[in-house]
Amino acid sequence: MMIRERIEEKLRAAFQPVFLEVVDESYRHNVPAGSESHFKVVLVSDRFTGERFLNRHRMIYSTLAEELSTTVHALALHTYTIKEWEGLQDTVFASPPCRGAGSIA
């Protein structure tokens, strides 16, 4: 199973999202092809109601602790309640460009 699929599976089980998108953005960074190390996650769930963004991120980090301790280097997290998501009208901001130094030969 690919890392992206494992991330999706764990997040679906933990948060029962109404919307979930996991995008492998590793190609945008200074890593070898096929690294599966940088991901963007858009997660919409009522589990976030009443939670600050920092705690929402901690909830995800806890869920993905194994992946973060091994293969996943970075997560760009976009976490919303259903009400917040409706207010955004399905608009999600793009991840910033890589600021890593050097290049992979």
Swiss-Prot record:
Keywords tagged on the record: Activator, DNA-binding, Repressor, Stress response, Transcription, Transcription regulation
Additional free-text comment from the UniProt record: Was predicted, by combining genome sequences, physical interactions and 3D structures analyses, to be a reductase that interacts with a glutaredoxin.
A Pfam family assignment: BolA
Entry function: Transcriptional regulator that plays an important role in general stress response. Has many effects on cell morphology, cell growth and cell division. Acts by regulating the transcription of many genes, including dacA (PBP-5), dacC (PBP-6), ampC and mreB. Probably involved in the coordination of genes that adapt the cell physiology in order to enhance cell adaptation and survival under stress conditions. Essential for normal cell morphology in stationary phase and under conditions of starvation.
Induction: Induced during the transition to the stationary phase, under the control of the sigma factor RpoS. Also induced during early logarithmic growth in response to several forms of stress (heat shock, acidic stress, oxidative stress, carbon-starvation stress and osmotic shock), and this induction can be partially RpoS independent.
Gene Ontology BP terms: cell redox homeostasis; DNA-templated transcription; intracellular iron ion homeostasis; iron-sulfur cluster assembly
NCBIfam families: PRK11628.1
Superkingdom assignment: Bacteria
One GO CC annotation: cytosol
Gene Ontology molecular function, alphabetical: DNA binding
Annotated protein name in UniProt: DNA-binding transcriptional regulator BolA
The UniProt record lists the keyword Transcription: yes
Family, similarity comment: Belongs to the BolA/IbaG family.
